[in-house]
Amino acid sequence: MTHAIADSRVPALLDFLSSSPTPWHATASMAQRLEQAGYRRLSETSSWQLAPGERAYVTRNDSSLIAFQLPKGDTSLSSLRMIGAHTDSPCLRLKPNPAQASQGWLTLGVETYGGVLLSTWFDRDLGLAGRVQVRHADGRRETLLLTVMRPFACVPSLAIHLDRDVNSGRAINAQTQMSAVVMQLGEEAGTPAEAFNTLLIELIEEQHGVRVADVVDFELGLYDLQPAAQSGLKGELITSARLDNLLSCFVGLEALLEADGSQGALFVTTDHEEVGSASACGAQGPFLADVLKRINHYVGLDSEEGYQCLVQRSLMISCDNAHAVHPNFADKHDAGHGPKLN
């Protein structure tokens, strides 16, 4: 007999999934959790002073994070147990100049980020989230997180009587068929770009309670407002957007926080996995190596050879998900080697 997932951490997982619509939100949430647990924030642009038993974390681009706990005692660090995950998920990102006018409506052009399952984005209540850089009246610039947690836009389907072949495997063109519909344009709205800029400023001011002179730049995307849930008749399943790979982020962070400090432990989450990881804050970038070298400098064998020894003696588990056998598509897996749910 199957039963509901009884782990007491499920509510925290559901909250993390629902409140982390972008890599920047996920990283901010994990950083807050670490600080609540007593971890010290480090800066890559400042000198570090590390000692045995240290618990600290550092971020890069506000979308990648490394947290570590050094072993207690006076012995030098010889190895680390590491877990790696990624903060990004496939989604629809706004184009740099997204505003368009179509048949009297303000629509926003989108670009696919990662391997997006396009059909699932139609006819949903979509919020808007990401980060924006604003300029204040005094000329000061500031980067802020933006989270619009109400139906901001939708990508409407075409009525079936205008597209009788829609259920016959029609290809979806994200460039021409998936612009997000936001609002009707009145004569007072100005150009589409002006209307969107005004709307964006209003949303920022509403959330942060500040006066904004202008929006300098943004990295924004749409997200499904349906919250994460424990589902199935007996509660056996967790359904949510961004399970790939925020589930692994949550599990990795929990594992680090539960470490007893007897051995070195490290947790790394990187951005841009869905688009190849080839960035300064991606897994192919130098972020992890940079941090390991600095750790080795203070509590390891402070040499290139010592760093190589640390790497070779350590173990990393790379965590990802969304690979389990689908009950309706079991033929997509090797019958003897399909990963099972639960």
Language model region names:
Residues 1-342:
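N-terminal hydrophobic/helix-forming segments and targeting peptides
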